[in-house]
């Protein structure tokens, strides 16, 4: 699945100042194929279904 991964609160991880290499490492460490900084958060490609993803309920 292509999505924003979510942290334990269901929120998107912010990318530090547009760092696509940092996001790529985060995404691949979660089992995704790659990722980039879609500021202000990391967008991942090919995440496994077991990974939590952002569902627009952060801070609600």
Swiss-Prot record:
GO terms for biological process: defense response. Transmembrane segments: none annotated. InterPro entries: LCN-type_CS_alpha_beta_dom, Scorpion_toxin-like, Scorpion_toxin-like_sf, Scorpion_toxinL, Scorpion_toxinL/defensin. One of its GO terms (molecular function) is toxin activity. Disulfide bonds join 11-58, 15-37, 23-42, 27-44. The keyword Disulfide bond applies. Keywords: Disulfide bond, Ion channel impairing toxin, Neurotoxin, Secreted, Toxin, Voltage-gated sodium channel impairing toxin. Residues 1-59 form the LCN-type CS-alpha/beta domain. It comes from the Eukaryota. Expressed by the venom gland. It is found in: Secreted. SMART domains: Knot1. CDD domains: neurotoxins_LC_scorpion. One of its GO terms (cellular component) is extracellular region. Its main location: secreted. Inhibits the sodium currents (Nav) in an apparent irreversible manner. Produces small depolarization and induces repetitive firing in squid axons. Is specific for arthropods (crickets, triatomides, crabs and squids), but is non-toxic to mice. Belongs to the long (4 C-C) scorpion toxin superfamily. Sodium channel inhibitor family. Beta subfamily. Has the structural arrangement of an alpha-helix connected to antiparallel beta-sheets by disulfide bonds (CS-alpha/beta). This is Toxin TdNa2. It comes from Tityus discrepans.
């Amino acid at each position: 699945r292509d999505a924003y991964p979510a942290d334990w609160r269901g929120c998107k991880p912010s990318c530090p100042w547009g760092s696509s290499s940092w996001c790529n490492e985060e995404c691949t460490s979660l089992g995704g194929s790659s990722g980039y900084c879609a500021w202000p958060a990391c967008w991942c490609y090919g995440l496994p279904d077991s990974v939590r993803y952002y569902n627009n309920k952060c801070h609600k």
